[in-house]
Amino acid sequence: MAAAETQSLREQPEMEDANSEKSINEENGEVSEDQSQNKHSRHKKKKHKHRSKHKKHKHSSEEDKDKKHKHKHKHKKHKRKEIIDASDKEGMSPAKRTKLDDLALLEDLEKQRALIKAELDNELMEGKVQSGMGLILQGYESGSEEEGEIHEKARNGNRSSTRSSSTKGKLELVDNKITTKKRSKSRSKERTRHRSDKKKSKGGIEIVKEKTTRSKSKERKKSKSPSKRSKSQDQARKSKSPTLRRRSQEKIGKARSPTDDKVKIEDKSKSKDRKKSPIINESRSRDRGKKSRSPVDLRGKSKDRRSRSKERKSKRSETDKEKKPIKSPSKDASSGKENRSPSRRPGRSPKRRSLSPKPRDKSRRSRSPLLNDRRSKQSKSPSRTLSPGRRAKSRSLERKRREPERRRLSSPRTRPRDDILSRRERSKDASPINRWSPTRRRSRSPIRRRSRSPLRRSRSPRRRSRSPRRRDRGRRSRSRLRRRSRSRGGRRRRSRSKVKEDKFKGSLSEGMKVEQESSSDDNLEDFDVEEEDEEALIEQRRIQRQAIVQKYKYLAEDSNMSVPSEPSSPQSSTRTRSPSPDDILERVAADVKEYERENVDTFEASVKAKHNLMTVEQNNGSSQKKLLAPDMFTESDDMFAAYFDSARLRAAGIGKDFKENPNLRDNWTDAEGYYRVNIGEVLDKRYNVYGYTGQGVFSNVVRARDNARANQEVAVKIIRNNELMQKTGLKELEFLKKLNDADPDDKFHCLRLFRHFYHKQHLCLVFEPLSMNLREVLKKYGKDVGLHIKAVRSYSQQLFLALKLLKRCNILHADIKPDNILVNESKTILKLCDFGSASHVADNDITPYLVSRFYRAPEIIIGKSYDYGIDMWSVGCTLYELYTGKILFPGKTNNHMLKLAMDLKGKMPNKMIRKGVFKDQHFDQNLNFMYIEVDKVTEREKVTVMSTINPTKDLLADLIGCQRLPEDQRKKVHQLKDLLDQILMLDPAKRISINQALQHAFIQEKI
């Protein structure tokens, strides 16, 4: 026993030096990464070589020489020492310790100081000369070997060689550290001073260089032997607080061999050693991180974890009584700079570790490729299959050493990713830990819960540094649960205000001293902020929901009040989130009736008011211009002339009395199949003809009075007498009946059919009487000026209602234009008429001449399949014409129509062009538009290929023209322009739908 004591005393200075040198190397982070793990034994030898080599630079005291001699016998003696070690540590007399301390302290510190300075000045980047700190760490690592034996075997299986060297190293370290408690204390103080100096000078370099240095240090650690690394890491974590350690050791002591007693002594000195070498922590935690970071490993270790968690639980309850914050083992896997705080004492709860959040994140990222490699090796290792006894032993040791680490990690600044992973993994295993904090988990919002997923493991650095509190929320939930109930009140308020002041208040990045504040307070502060965040979020969302509900309630009431004439469902409103189509239609119909009531006699006045808005010069200029352009609707060729006694009709002989020309009695039909109308004749024994309205493609129309119904005025449409026209007339009859049946209340502004009959082999349809069509209205009231915006808005509402009914009945009108829209006497109500071109939506034969040319949609021209969109296009052209009095697209040919449409909306989409049957008439192989125009000089057709067509027509300028509009009207014109833009989309798929049009602001908002 005495021999063992003296040997350990002699070995002590060298071991201290080895430790110090290794820690400096690791702190500088210069280790090469590409040396493989299986070379560990060679490096062990090298390490001893280094130790002896560097003794030149150190004190060569008598003890050292003696020690060198004794060193040879270490291997033989280590087994005996394991047994007597426990009594050794008790037997050490304080006098010997003091004596030893006094002997070596001064010399030691002097030389180490010089070495550290030299290292700082010269070898910071190279790391070739191993300093005193490095040597200390080296001895420290070799001393930790025995405990890590199992991990060593897991890595390479070379257990026997490892054990001999590891035990030898361990004996050195144990005795060594018993005798040098005081010296290591003073030395650690000295080193702490140095390191803070060094940190100041080194700050910039570390941040810039940290990726390189860390990877280097990793490599050297790796090459020094993975076994040592893991073992030293394992042990170094044990010793944060002596009390804690002692208690947990008592708990676990049963499962340990006598050699484990050494841990107690080592722990004391190692807690001081940790102060000396913060980067040891880095390497340790990194190694630990390897275990918990990889999902594969998590699965592999879940069994271990389950059994561990039981022991953990008992230990936790113990430490809870001491009010020490303890986290689950997985929480200790902090990485990189998180563990850098040099001046930490075991008793304190350090609040911060990182130089700054960003470098920490960088280090995480830079390490990852290597970690994956190591992880995969580890997961395959046999350590998972160790005997239960051995596994329990290593587990208990591991757990014991993790407790201080847990405390160290409880700072708000550190939240390792492994923490998240292992927590998730533990919840899968349903370990007792989950039962410690049910409320904590339940209170988590879905968003936060989601952040645990593997994908979120690698959160962005920005996020990690932005919310340090959130990062380690779950970490301290266990011990916190009881404490919270006790100290909730004032402390929570205090900590909340603290957090709000400055979220980075406690970080070492400001170079501040660590405040001595209880870690339980820390934990509370963190938890309460999170809780408050969640509650605030929930409250905020609840308020938003209420506001939305209130808003729509109010809007619904508002819309119900504003439409008193029409019953509407309680929740109905066109402004609610999703008003039903019926509600929209009700509102629009009510608007129309209101307009009708208010404007019975004001139509002409409103048109005059619009005329007055035009400037005199513009009026003159435009009228002169118009004289030059031929009007296609002049009376001479207007088939909708208002009066039957026009010169043309008289010349044709229509309107002469029968008595004057009795030969006409048998000649009812002219050469083209039209019925020869005679004023005064009676049709079907009841309709007394008194006027002639006009002649269309399919028919001519007369005005009559119904003798059977108290001379009620009607319009009688007499279809041309030929097979095709009869067929067309019957089709129109069918559609009209269908539409009328679908609209019994006459809300949808399609012409009402009263009845039909045959007269002289002509099919006759009897309609409600309407005075004029919109073409005539425009000529009479709004030539080149158009109608008032109020009238246009009302007409547009009614037209959209008519389209709605058509769509409900699956009918395409296919000839909407001002000529086919009739108005009543007061010009307030319009009706869509002339369904001679109408068809069922499924029977849409592709023909390029469907619909009157000026109102023909582009899909018809290129021969693409079409649907209700063609009627919407026609309505858009009609509305423009109603407001401006000008035709929107006065194309001379289909090709010209396409050119004019593209001048407004830009080039037609290629996708649409390709679907056109007649695309080759208007587009080349590259889908460039071929504009066919007649040369003004030669009067021959010339083709201009236009690869791009930029929209040049300004719709708004055309709509406003030279009017000086008041603000309310200007707003409506802007809305009309927006509506027309959506109606006149070249691609019918993008064109506005009828429901959308009915909800448009132009339709909904009153003037």
From Swiss-Prot:
Gene name as annotated: PRP4K
Residue sites binding ATP per the record: 693-701, 717
Name by which UniProt lists this protein: Serine/threonine-protein kinase PRP4 homolog
Biased composition (Acidic residues): 518-533
Enzyme Commission no: 2.7.11.1
Chain positions found as N6-acetyllysine: 99, 717
Function, as annotated: Serine/threonine kinase involved in spliceosomal assembly as well as mitosis and signaling regulation. Connects chromatin mediated regulation of transcription and pre-mRNA splicing. During spliceosomal assembly, interacts with and phosphorylates PRPF6 and PRPF31, components of the U4/U6-U5 tri-small nuclear ribonucleoprotein (snRNP), to facilitate the formation of the spliceosome B complex. Plays a role in regulating transcription and the spindle assembly checkpoint (SAC).
Residue spans of biased composition, Basic residues class: 39-59, 67-81, 179-202, 214-230, 302-315, 342-367, 438-497
Compartmental location: Nucleus; Chromosome, Centromere, Kinetochore
